[in-house]
């Protein structure tokens, strides 16, 4: 029962979208930008020498557009169609989008940071030594081949030596081994008392991406392939009768899956907050040794524990006790081989990729070793790398400009709240107080993680992984009983993403996302508002989506809505959900409106806020037409450009089934068709496919 960091936060892009990267945009001289637009852009952009926007002549890569498509029929294809028709997803990727492009830039930069650290001949124990040696050990494939399974043999022997169910639990609690957990336990901010940390407990333990992969006929072929995969993992470890043992492990996991809550159910913050005393835990789920487990974790003195999925935990405990120890040992062995595969011999590494990459996501080729090494270092020492990343690659002026943009968006949203017709004064007062209490974090943390306790060597990548796991475990559990670390970040500066934390009531924008197509100081003002402005609005909007609205300005899970206003909100949310339920990204896979509701509300609210802020910023000004596009057109085009992307079919199926975000096409078309200004900007009429009658258009925030 390893720790799992429970983040009460909502990210801009899902994990699947985080293959992100840099764009090779066209640059142009400052004399090419229209004078009136230049004067506007300077208000939010750097006053350093202009070199022109990275993309196109004003921030949009117009060569990617497909003018033959009517914007009212498919706005996403109108803005991105030529790119969608001609771009080929790299063989090493399951998808490719704006995030991927920036991720690749970040990846190259981090590689340079790592190489410089390795070449520095730094003293033992220094950050540079640890960064360089972690990467060097990962890259030494000759040594990895020669070592075989020897580096993990002691761990495998420990699994094989287990004799009782309690022995299995002890292994699951031990961060020095890669034992998979059937129940996740970790420390996070208490959702109802956000001034303290509490222990959270929830369902865990599946080897496939989601419970549906075990239970739905749509994924029956994946279930068969997974059993074959489990058999190979056990064979690598020398387990006899591996095929039969794999079937037993699969049956155990399927039983867990049947007990698990769906992803949509786990979004409900009221239903996932359930306090239990230690005695109540033992009564509810007696199949697990709660008292000794909490003592091992140093959490036995807690007044209560928060269980996110009570029925799943209760059933998991029964399944665990009813499962033979031999099956549980094999479950742990298969999980360990999979966990360490990147630093085990090529035969094992290739087999794991064949299943997790090719079978599950349709990816033809494994990523180059150096890229995987960069990811490994980022995972182990992300903030150490991030500190250097910020020093080298993040202009301080970008932070100032973002501060100004956030200020503009907040002020604009406050105006919208003041004039929101469907909300009563009592709820409005609370909403404005919450907005006023928002904390923005931009670029990088004020304080950096101290990695002095992390031990790293240049010749043992397996041990490096162990030490990184132990370090993360200790970092998490050391927070229990301590004051809230308000300066903590949950993403590194080199991460291309953003998030909102409900328990902290904060919006966070790492440095790496503050690049084109999201943000470009040299781009047209409308483009920046339609891109990063909408991203800012999206994150603010999460504080007021179907789940974020349940927290107040302090971050506490508290119902501050009148019944009437809550009902009006739900009516609007349901109407939006009904629209998204009709969208079918891939045949047979429709968007789940319950799973994606928060993100869909964030997208619609974010773009609406950004448009309002853009009109405030340009009020009374003569906004020019650029390359034939009005300011409003450029604003909406920027939103569409941000979300352009392609998926392999298997990856798209997984995205639709497991991701709380709608895919790019519907993040664009599903939003703009609800906004009156888009209809006016592109002269959309009843004859167009995206047209919605005015009374069917949803406006929440």
Predicted regions: what they are:
Residues 1-11:
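Bacterial N-terminal signal peptides that target proteins for export
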Residues 19-22:
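C-terminal motif of bacterial Sec signal peptides marking the signal peptidase cleavage site
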Residues 24-27:
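Bacterial signal peptide processing site
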Residues 31-51:
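Post-signal peptide N-terminal segment of mature Sec-exported envelope proteins
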Residues 46-63:
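Short, Gly/Pro- and small/polar-rich lid/capping loops
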Residues 51-56, 69-143:
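Active-site-surrounding "flap" and adjacent substrate/cofactor-binding loops of secreted or lumenal enzymes
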Residues 117-408:
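Noncatalytic, helix-rich "gating/capping" subdomain that lines the substrate-entry/channel surface
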Residues 284-287, 306, 310, 334, ...:
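Intrinsically disordered, low-complexity linker/terminal regions across diverse proteins
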């Amino acid at each position: 029962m390893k720790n799992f960091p429970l983040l009460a936060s909502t990210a801009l892009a899902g994990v699947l979208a985080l293959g992100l990267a840099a764009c090779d945009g066209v640059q142009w001289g400052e004399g090419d930008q229209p004078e009136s637009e230049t004067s506007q852009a300077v208000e939010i952009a750097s006053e350093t020498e202009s070199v022109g926007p990275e993309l196109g002549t004003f921030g949009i890569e117009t060569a990617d557009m497909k003018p033959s498509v009517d914007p009212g029929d498919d706005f996403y294809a109108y803005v991105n169609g030529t790119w969608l028709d001609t771009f080929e997803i790299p063989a090493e990727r399951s998808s490719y989008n704006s995030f991927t492009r920036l991720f690749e830039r970040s990846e190259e930069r981090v590689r340079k940071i790592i190489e410089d650290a390795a070449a520095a001949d730094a003293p033992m124990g220094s950050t540079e030594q640890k960064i360089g040696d972690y990467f060097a050990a990962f890259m030494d494939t000759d040594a990895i081949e020669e070592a075989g399974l020897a580096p993990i043999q002691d761990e495998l022997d420990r699994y094989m030596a287990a004799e009782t169910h309690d022995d299995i639990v002890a292994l699951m609690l031990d961060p020095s081994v890669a034992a998979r957990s059937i129940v996740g336990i970790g420390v996070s901010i208490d959702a109802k008392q956000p001034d303290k940390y509490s222990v959270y407990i929830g369902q865990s333990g599946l080897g496939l991406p989601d419970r549906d992969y075990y239970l739905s006929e749509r994924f029956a072929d994946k279930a068969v392939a997974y059993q074959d995969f489990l058999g190979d993992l056990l064979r690598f470890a020398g387990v006899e009768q591996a095929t039969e043992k794999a079937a037993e492990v699969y049956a155990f996991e399927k039983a867990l899956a049947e007990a698990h809550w769906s992803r949509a159910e786990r979004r409900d913050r009221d239903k996932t907050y359930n306090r239990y005393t230690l005695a109540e835990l033992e009564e509810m789920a007696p199949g697990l040794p709660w008292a000794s487990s909490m003592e091992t974790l140093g959490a036995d003195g807690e007044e209560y524990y928060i269980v996110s999925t009570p029925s799943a935990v209760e059933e998991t405990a029964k399944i665990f006790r009813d499962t033979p120890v031999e099956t549980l040992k094999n479950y742990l062995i298969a999980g360990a081989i999979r966990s360490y595969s990147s630093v085990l011999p090529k035969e094992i590494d290739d087999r794991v990729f064949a299943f997790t990459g090719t079978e599950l996501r349709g990816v033809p080729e494994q990523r180059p070793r150096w890229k995987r090494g960069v990811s490994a270092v980022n995972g182990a020492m992300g903030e150490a790398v991030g500190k250097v990343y910020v020093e080298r690659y993040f202009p301080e002026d970008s932070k100032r400009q973002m501060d100004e943009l956030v200020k503009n968006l907040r002020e604009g949203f406050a105006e919208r709240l003041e004039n929101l017709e469907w909300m009563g004064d009592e709820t409005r007062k609370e909403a404005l107080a919450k907005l006023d209490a928002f904390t923005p974090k931009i670029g990088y943390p004020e304080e950096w993680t101290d990695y002095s306790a992390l031990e790293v060597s240049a010749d043992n990548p397996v041990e490096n992984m162990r030490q990184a796991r132990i370090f993360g475990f200790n970092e998490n559990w050391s927070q229990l009983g301590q004051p809230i670390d308000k300066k903590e970040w949950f993403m590194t500066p080199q991460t291309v993403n953003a998030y909102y934390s409900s328990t902290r009531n904060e919006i966070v924008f790492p440095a790496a996302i503050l690049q084109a197509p999201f943000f470009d100081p040299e781009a047209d003002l409308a483009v920046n508002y339609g891109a990063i402005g909408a991203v800012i609005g999206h994150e603010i909007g999460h504080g007021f989506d179907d789940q974020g609205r349940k927290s107040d300005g302090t971050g506490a899970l508290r119902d501050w809505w009148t019944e009437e206003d809550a009902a009006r909100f739900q009516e609007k949310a349901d109407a939006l959900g009904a629209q998204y339920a009709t969208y079918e990204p891939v045949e047979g896979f429709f968007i789940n409106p319950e799973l994606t509701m928060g993100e869909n509300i964030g997208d619609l609210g974010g773009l609406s806020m950004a448009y309002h802020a853009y009109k405030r910023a340009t009020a009374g000004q003569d906004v020019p037409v650029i390359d034939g596009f009005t300011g409003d057109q450029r604003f909406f085009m920027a939103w569409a450009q941000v979300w352009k992307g392609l998926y392999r079919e298997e990856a798209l199926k997984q995205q639709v089934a497991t991701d709380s975000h709608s895919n790019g096409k519907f993040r664009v078309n599903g939003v703009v068709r609800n906004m009156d200004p888009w209809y006016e900007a592109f002269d959309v009429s009843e004859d167009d496919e995206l047209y919605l009658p005015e009374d069917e258009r949803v406006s929440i925030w």
